[in-house]
Regions:
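Bacterial signal peptide processing site
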Residues: 18-21
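An acidic-aromatic
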Residues: 72-119
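Sec-dependent signal peptide recognition
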Residues: 2-8
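Non-transmembrane domains of secretory- and envelope-associated proteins
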Residues: 98, 137-193
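C-terminal motif of bacterial Sec signal peptides marking the signal peptidase cleavage site
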Residues: 13-16
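Post-signal peptide N-terminal segment of mature Sec-exported envelope proteins
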Residues: 24-49
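Flexible, processing/modification-adjacent segments and terminal tails
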Residues: 99-147
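Extended beta-sheet lipid-handling architectures
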Residues: 41-46, 56-63, 75, 82, ...
């Protein structure tokens, strides 16, 4: 009888030690080598210089990027650090908000084909910004480098990079802003040169 009780006790202990959790396999999404080279987040400060007829105009700002989602550029007024303009680029569209004149342009990838170099893609912008953040990378980009030949004289200097996680809230345009055409915006920008 003792032997049976002893075996039952061992059986109960062994059954009680069995894990109730089951192992399941989860699929890890495949990432290409070029995607793996791009950090999930990238931020930097920037200096935009636009040479004009009466000299050049420079303005500072910030750049934030969440890979494969959006790039947000804020151009800030010197000293006061008030936002003058915001440019938000996603894989499908570009939003340019002129905070000073309360106007904006929202253009799709197809609408931008007229002013951008051929085959300009969001992934190319990500690669340019990522390469600039690497030691020895090209940190001064021209309008031509960015795929905007009409603004080839403009220069963007990127510095003070960070790959820490950050929050990028999509830009919402309120009814106080007036939508203008892409052609009107380009005329205004080219007139500065």
């Amino acid at each position: 009888m003792n032997r049976i009780a002893y075996f039952l006790l061992i059986a109960v202990v062994l059954v009680g030690c069995k894990s109730s959790k089951r192992l399941t396999a989860t699929k890890v999404p495949e990432v290409t080598a070029s995607e793996a080279a791009i950090p999930s987040y990238l931020a930097s400060r920037l200096q935009l210089t636009i040479p004009g007829k009466g000299g050049s105009m420079s303005v500072g700002g910030t750049m934030k990027m969440k890979s494969r989602e959006r790039v947000q550029i804020s151009l800030l007024m010197p000293i006061l650090r008030t936002e003058l303009a915001r440019i938000e680029v996603t894989p499908t569209e570009v939003l340019f908000v002129d905070r000073m004149n309360k106007r904006f342009v929202r253009a799709t990838k197809n609408e931008l084909k007229e002013i951008l170099s051929k085959n300009v893609e969001f992934s190319q912008l990500e690669k340019l910004l990522t390469d600039a953040s690497k030691p020895g990378g090209k940190t001064e980009l021209s309008g031509k480098d960015l795929g905007i030949p009409k603004l080839e004289k403009a220069k963007v200097q990127l510095y003070d990079f960070s790959t820490k996680e950050l929050s990028i809230t999509p830009t919402e345009v309120t009814s106080r802003y007036r939508q203008v055409s892409l052609e009107e915006l380009m005329k205004m920008l080219v007139a500065l040169l």
